[in-house]
Swiss-Prot record:
The keyword Coiled coil applies. The modification N-acetylalanine is found at residue 2. It comes from Homo sapiens (Human). There is a cross-link at residues 108, 179, 208, 239 (Glycyl lysine isopeptide (Lys-Gly) (interchain with G-Cter in SUMO2)). One of its GO terms (biological process) is maturation of 5.8S rRNA. The gene is RRP15. GO terms for cellular component: preribosome, large subunit precursor. Residues 1-125, 218-282 are annotated as: Disordered. This is RRP15-like protein. The modification Phosphoserine is found at residues 11, 58, 67, 206, 266, 276, 280. Residues 108-144 form a coiled coil. Residues 35-44, 59-72 have a biased composition (Acidic residues).
Length: 282
């Protein structure tokens, strides 16, 4: 019996090896359908392959060999799935690297990050802003060059003097305007109702008249100064009128003489000389 059992096993193995390929395909198809229904992940698929392998072990020893042959393709499929996912990631990385490392011409803005035209424009705008800021700083520095904040405590007296001068100038200006208006009104009244005379009078009024009035409103100081100058001018005029005793030293010597009187003036001194000599003899 012991010898018969090994012989039967060998015969069964030979029969299984001689079975047609159709039966093997049917078995593998059934295993694949069971695996697809039960497996949700790669780990579940491995568990399902193990369960099917146990099932076939319990049925027969011959099917054990077939299940082992089927389990190996399951492991290979999982490995292939992992390799395919890694391969797709590597392909994506290679494609992105090619795109990023690709040298594009500057005239064609295909990739905005690699386009240097925009960078040049940004740098140009930045330089223009910096130049504007520098120009503004220079202008402010020029305007604030000689400006000094006044000190209220130290410059108190000078500020008072300046205020007095300003008030005097304003008062003098308004007084001059009022006086000039009065003068013009008086002249218009003197002209009467004739429009021609009024137009002629208004045309004669000019800026110089107002400036002369404004200069005449300097106050008592100008009047006293003018009164002091007048006597000096009179004294000089009197001295010039008296002049030197000898007529030759005068400035107007021979200015009013005519050609017909040339002999008379020359005879005068000659006639006087003998008279003086006769007087001396007597």
């Amino acid at each position: 019996m012991a010898a018969a059992a090994p012989d039967s096993r060998v015969s069964e193995e030979e029969n299984l090896k001689k079975t047609p390929k159709k039966k093997m395909k049917m078995v593998t198809g059934a295993v694949a359908s069971v695996l697809e229904d039960e497996a949700t992940d790669t780990s579940d698929s491995e568990g399902s392959c193990g369960s099917e392998k146990d099932h076939f072990y319990s049925d027969d020893d011959a099917i054990e060999a077939d299940s082992e042959g089927d389990a190996e393709p399951c492991d290979k499929e999982n490995e292939n799935d992992g390799e395919s996912s890694v391969g797709t990631n590597m392909g994506w990385a290679d494609a992105m690297a090619k795109v990023l490392n690709k040298k594009t011409p500057e005239s064609k803005p295909t990739i905005l990050v690699k386009n240097k035209k925009l960078e040049k424009e940004k740098e140009k705008l930045k330089q223009e802003r910096l130049e504007k800021i520098k120009q503004r700083d220079k202008r402010l520095e020029w305007e604030m060059m000689c400006r000094v904040k006044p000190d209220v405590v130290q410059d108190k007296e000078t500020e008072r003097n300046l205020q007095r001068i300003a008030t005097r100038g304003v008062v003098q200006l308004f007084n001059a305007v009022q006086k000039h208006q009065k003068n013009v009104d008086e002249k218009v009244k003197e002209a009467g109702s004739s429009m021609r005379k009024r137009a002629k009078l208004i045309s004669t009024v000019s800026k110089k008249d107002f400036i002369s009035v404004l200069r005449g409103m300097d106050g008592s100081t100008n009047e006293t100064a003018s009164s002091r100058k007048k006597p000096k001018a009179k004294q000089t005029e009197v001295k010039s009128e008296e002049g030197p005793g000898w007529t030759i030293l005068r400035d107007d010597f021979m200015m009013g003489a005519s050609m017909k009187d040339w002999d008379k003036e020359s005879d005068g001194p000659d006639d006087s000389r003998p008279e003086s000599a006769s007087d001396s003899d007597t």
